[in-house]
């Protein structure tokens, strides 16, 4: 029986999941974007200060999908559509899920809509929740959500993703889980700005509480169940990302609080800041649905240099 997994995307999340799940599979194919990246990572053969196990194979060819029981996408949202386009002729009936967060930058759609466009015969499935890649590798206990409208699909992926230290919960609200995973990154930038300005826990509490309201309003407008936002992929992920400096988004906000330019703040982080990439897309969707998101609007003004960090928070 085939017991191999393909993970597309060898960044922090893809690598962390390859390491965490390596004991559950005979082979894990970890795909990079091109041969040069594959060769470089193959020589390094480690990520997040931990070596890859011997059954993790670095590659760049989608042909390895033909030898896998499942495919997990862990690319940035900007690459999600192109990945689906490139693999649609290889996957046949192979189950596919993703840990990618955000909206499709080309269409402003949620990613399950992009998925349905390219893979009409598959059941979309997203995996999201309050986790950091570094802590997954360190095997610190955590919980995550597997969301799909199809019960067999979410049960399948729950079994794949769950380990002794990573507990998987299932949810049928694929819209709500995606909205939570995207909006929380923007709110974490706001939390980072407040922290960088030296404001205290009460400010963080207010931002998280009112931010949750913004997230919920948008999600419900898009068809989500408001209860979803009280769970791991809503409040749980929001609290984590707003409260810990392992979050790139929070660190980015702290950089902005120093009154430096957005470009300089991004350079200082030197990694993908998902909340910044999602910011304009989320607000575009919110405005088109007449949803007010004042915290997110203030984050946009700060990144565009149209207001100061202090004015935005106060």
Label the predicted regions.
Residues 90, 114-122, 141-228:
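Internal alpha-helical scaffold of NAD(P)-dependent oxidoreductase catalytic cores
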Residues 191-192, 220-230, 234, 238-314:
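NAD(P)-dependent Rossmann-like dehydrogenase/reductase catalytic/cofactor-binding core
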Residues 51-139, 157:
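Rossmann-like NAD(P)(H) cofactor-binding subdomain of soluble oxidoreductases
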Residues 11, 15, 35, 58-59, ...:
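Electropositive phosphate-/nucleotide-binding environments in soluble metabolic enzymes
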Residues 66-67, 183, 235:
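Alpha-helix C-terminal capping/helix-to-coil transition sites in glycosyltransferase folds
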Residues 1-60:
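NAD(P)+-binding Rossmann beta1-loop-alpha1 motif at the extreme N-terminus of oxidoreductases
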Residues 98, 123-128, 168-172, 231, ...:
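General beta-strand structural signal in soluble alpha/beta enzymes
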